[in-house]
Amino acid sequence: MQTIFAQATARGKAGVAIIRISGPDAFEVGRCLLGSLPDAGRFALRDVRTPLGELLDRGLVLVFKAPASFTGEDTVELQLHGSVAVVRAVEGAIRSTGLARLADAGEFTQRALLNDMLDLTQVEGLGRLIDSETEAQRKVAQASFEGGLSDKAERWRHLMIRAAALLEASIDFVDEDVPVDVVPEVQSILMGLDTDLAKEVTGAVVAERLHDGFEVAILGAPNAGKSTLLNVLADREIAITSDVPGTTRDVIEARLDVSGLPVTFLDTAGIRDTVDVIEKIGVQRAIDRALAADVRILLEIDDWILPDVLSDTIDFRYRAKADLSDGEGISGRTGVGIDRLLTDIEGVLSEKMSAVRSAVTDRQRGGIEAARVSLDAGVTVLSGTAELELAAEHIRHAQRSLDSVIGRVDVENLLGEIFSRFCIGK
């Protein structure tokens, strides 16, 4: 395997830049540039020179001996001054040794996977951790990166192996006097697994919303103050406000951090019967987005009736334009009621978040759901004809589905897509 190198910190001018070198010739590359290396696990200040002796920079050098490194390979890290020119010169010097090439996107992490330093769920958790923008996203992604889903998957896998082994033993000794009926125990194992997997799937749906951002739809009649409220929440003018009803035609979005949760507020068209074709399209879009949203808030005004299709979906109702009435309700102009609004939204979303255990991706959820389908089929067989061979085959199918989640089998075609989302130095 070739030795690779890349800048591990962001490109551009900065205080410090880190260049990582990993692979069988990493130490030799380091000696070409530094003369000598500190002992593994130690750091030292060194002059960085070209193979011909030209001084390029002076910085800290860290050495990691395989397998005690991120990639599981011999690794050298150079902490340099973050000048674009310095980084370019040092990378050129590394390349000139002929011992290393520039890494592909995500190649360091890919090597960590291939060297069993990480499994596939941890790799995907790392990707989510890098992408995290809010505290809730960070915590959930960190749980995946630390192996939260991996540990559960291993436990489920061992239970499946035990259930299949019990059935196989009964099949092998079918003509002998086997004193114990294993079917009740196997059924108990499978039903317990089904409960665990169902909880994980439920949490996965919310985890995906956490990654993409929860949606909160602001609904109401035309000129109810929805756009004004959105502008106040976003702390900038992103929606046009006017006394003319029907100003908002399309859905306007503002992404915010609400107590560590990523939330996209949706300013929707005022809902009313209209003969205006364009406004009618806007009203339908408002209804469609509201039905798909995680939370729906309604700004109420007198003499206006919410359409039946939305009447049972509203999470919170607030009196609109409180600045023009007795002060009860909510007002985008004065800020009355906005703290209560945010607290209400946080409460609903925090309750949804209680089902999330780790940053489960769509791919992982698909594998878990497939495993659950196979387990349910096994339970059905055992409850009916009790054909042990068929039930055992369903369990083996479930195990293969679970193995694909953590990267034991059938993942080669996924690696290119997964690692292409990483930066060059990761």
From Swiss-Prot:
Offer one Pfam family short name for this entry: MnmE_helical
In which compartments does the protein localize? Cytoplasm
Task: Quote the record's binding site residues for GTP.
Answer: 223-228, 242-248, 267-270
One of the GO biological process terms: tRNA wobble uridine modification
Q: Which GO terms describe its cellular component?
A: cytoplasm
Q: Which SUPFAM superfamilies match?
A: Folate-binding domain, P-loop containing nucleoside triphosphate hydrolases, TrmE connector domain
Top-level taxon in the UniProt lineage: Bacteria
Name of this protein: tRNA modification GTPase MnmE
- NCBIfam families recorded: PRK05291.1-3, small_GTP
Q: Where is the TrmE-type G domain?
A: 213-350
Named cofactor requirement(s): K(+)
